[in-house]
């Protein structure tokens, strides 16, 4: 009995995937690719996916294994229950921890959570909802870092995975700060995508959840003016204001003064026992109005000091975006032309090869042709490889310019403006850490300091926020880190301004030299 003719087929099928696995192993399982993932900001799209997946696992483990701590959740539910029962007087909406002090968007969002969690009793479900909020915010934050290509991926990995306080704030405390920060980062992403109206809506909603989002307002105003001009800026500010009136309407119609005093109380006194940054002050000095006015004056002074760099950065960002809008269509057109030319060339080459093949076939006898084909098939079966064919469609190099790093010019002023507000705050409570946590790596990498100093700043800040209760030493260390970080960013920013001024001066000198030289050359020619 003749042996079966299909003995070699399984061999060829096994070798194809093994070859593919070898190629993947050679390309990705090596030290160079690991270094690329760790240190190259261009690898952030890949690393971001890994971070989000790992964070999902970490949050589930924290929820399952670490006990929940009740602080404000019940009070939030009690305040919302009063609203749902028909009370629109803010002075009457209270919980176990005190009166309601947040704007109307907070009331609506937590009223939704009130229903979803069975009047606030299903805390475990609320924890998983806040875990989703955390993951969604991480996606928005990582998108900004991916666009800017400023910070190495390993820094974001370390900062995300090593902060117990941040995970605690989101899934073990259920504060309203995460909701406000989520809307804030959604607004920043929309602004950078030039979706101004949606960005303004998200920003206004964030302010409607918690008033600390106003710390970004000075930078946002300049960003509006630099990109939109005065009239369109007024339109966006009107959108923000109208949305605040709309969400506050049930309270403004009935008890307007109580709503404004309760939700936008700029003079509210914080309790000294919860302060993270001013433990070294006495309670009397901490609560003095003069001390608050000094901090406000310092805040405004620092904003004025950085107003010119902020405006310069925003204008430079706008100019680069305009260049992008001019160049990108040209690049796309050039690439399409190349592709069309490549297709035409490939078609001509294919016709030429077929013509040559026909000429060669005419010179061979039928017996020779069959012998060559049989020999080729036997080689394919023994090696598991296909016959080599001429590469008619070789991949053409395409033109491309990556413009997204220009978002560095927009992000730094936003993060810096918020950081100044946090550093000059009358008091910082533990949940306020998320106000600037996700921007700290960006700010630290915007300083001229060495890597060791950068790690030290991030490490000490994390230590200060994890010290409970706060001590004199931890509060002083936090202020020192804020000061060192602010000085470093200022050095970086003003160095860029000096370089910019030098380049402009050189350009003016070159232009004046050319203008002065033109009459002389014309006289010589005459």
Curated annotation (Swiss-Prot):
InterPro entries: Glycosyltransferase_ALG3. Pathway: Protein modification; protein glycosylation. One of its GO terms (cellular component) is endoplasmic reticulum membrane. Its EC number is 2.4.1.258. It holds the Pfam family ALG3. One of its GO terms (molecular function) is dol-P-Man:Man(5)GlcNAc(2)-PP-Dol alpha-1,3-mannosyltransferase activity. It is found in: Endoplasmic reticulum membrane. The keyword Transmembrane helix applies. It catalyses: an alpha-D-Man-(1->2)-alpha-D-Man-(1->2)-alpha-D-Man-(1->3)-[alpha-D-Man-(1->6)]-beta-D-Man-(1->4)-beta-D-GlcNAc-(1->4)-alpha-D-GlcNAc-diphospho-di-trans,poly-cis-dolichol + a di-trans,poly-cis-dolichyl beta-D-mannosyl phosphate = an alpha-D-Man-(1->2)-alpha-D-Man-(1->2)-alpha-D-Man-(1->3)-[alpha-D-Man-(1->3)-alpha-D-Man-(1->6)]-beta-D-Man-(1->4)-beta-D-GlcNAc-(1->4)-alpha-D-GlcNAc-diphospho-di-trans,poly-cis-dolichol + a di-trans,poly-cis-dolichyl phosphate + H(+). It is a multi-pass membrane protein. The chain crosses the membrane at residues 43-63, 98-118, 125-145, 171-191, 211-231, 232-252, 294-314, 405-425, 432-452, 470-490. Residues 1-42, 119-124, 192-210, 253-293, 426-431, 491-526 are cytoplasmic. Probable alpha-1,3-mannosyltransferase involved in the N-glycosylation pathway. Involved in glycosylation of the TNF receptor grnd, regulating its ligand affinity. Required for normal epithelial growth and architecture. Suppressor of JNK-dependent intestinal stem cell proliferation. This is Dolichyl-P-Man:Man5GlcNAc2-PP-dolichol alpha-1,3-mannosyltransferase Alg3. The gene is l(2)not.
């Amino acid at each position: 009995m003749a042996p079966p003719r299909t003995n070699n087929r399984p061999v060829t099928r096994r070798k194809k995937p093994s070859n593919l696995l070898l190629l993947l192993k050679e390309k990705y399982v090596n030290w160079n690719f690991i270094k690329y993932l760790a240190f190259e900001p261009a690898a952030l799209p890949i690393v971001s996916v890994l971070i989000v997946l790992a964070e999902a696992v970490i949050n589930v483990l924290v929820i399952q294994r670490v006990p929940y701590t009740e602080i404000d959740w019940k009070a939030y539910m009690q305040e919302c229950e009063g609203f749902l029962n028909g009370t629109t007087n803010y002075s009457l909406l209270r919980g176990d921890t005190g009166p309601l002090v947040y704007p109307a968007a907070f009331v609506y969002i937590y009223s939704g959570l009130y229903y979803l969690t069975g009047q606030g009793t299903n805390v475990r479900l609320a924890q998983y909802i806040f875990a989703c909020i955390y993951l969604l915010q991480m996606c928005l934050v990582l998108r900004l870092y991916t666009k800017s290509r400023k910070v190495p991926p390993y820094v974001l990995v370390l900062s995300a995975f090593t902060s117990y306080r941040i995970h605690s704030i989101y899934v073990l405390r259920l504060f309203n700060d995460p909701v406000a920060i989520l809307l804030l980062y959604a607004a920043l992403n929309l602004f950078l995508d030039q979706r101004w109206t949606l960005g303004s809506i998200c920003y206004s909603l964030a302010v409607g959840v918690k008033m600390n989002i106003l710390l970004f307002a000075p930078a946002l105003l300049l960003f509006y003016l630099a990109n939109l001009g005065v009239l369109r800026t007024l339109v966006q500010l009107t959108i923000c204001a109208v949305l605040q009136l709309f969400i506050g309407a049930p309270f403004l119609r009935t008890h307007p003064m109580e709503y404004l005093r309760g939700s936008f109380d700029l003079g509210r006194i914080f309790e000294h026992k919860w302060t993270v940054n001013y433990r070294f002050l006495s309670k009397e000095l901490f609560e003095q109005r003069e001390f608050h006015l000094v901090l406000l004056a310092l805040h405004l002074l620092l904003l004025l000091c950085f107003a010119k760099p902020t405006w310069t950065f925003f204008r430079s960002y706008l100019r680069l975006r305009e260049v992008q809008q001019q160049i990108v269509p040209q690049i796309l057109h050039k690439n399409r032309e190349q592709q069309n030319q490549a297709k035409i060339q490939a078609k001509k080459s294919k016709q030429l090869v077929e013509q040559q093949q026909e000429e060669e076939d005419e010179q061979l006898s039928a017996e020779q042709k069959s012998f060559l084909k049989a020999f080729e098939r036997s080689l394919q079966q023994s090696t598991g490889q296909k016959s080599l064919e001429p590469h008619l469609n070789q991949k053409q190099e395409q033109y491309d310019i990556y413009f997204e790093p220009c978002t560095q010019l927009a992000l730094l002023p936003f993060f810096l403006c918020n950081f100044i507000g946090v550093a000059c705050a009358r008091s910082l409570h533990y949940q306020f850490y998320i106000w600037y946590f996700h921007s700290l790596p960006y700010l630290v990498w915007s300083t001229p300091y060495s890597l060791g100093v950068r790690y030290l700043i991030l490490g000490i800040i994390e230590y200060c926020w994890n010290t409970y209760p706060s001590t004199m030493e931890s509060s002083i260390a936090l202020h020192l880190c804020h000061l060192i970080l602010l000085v470093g960013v200022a050095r970086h920013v003003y160095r860029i301004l000096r370089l910019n001024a030098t380049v402009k001066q050189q350009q003016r000198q070159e232009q004046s030299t050319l203008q002065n030289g033109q009459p002389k050359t014309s006289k010589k020619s005459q």
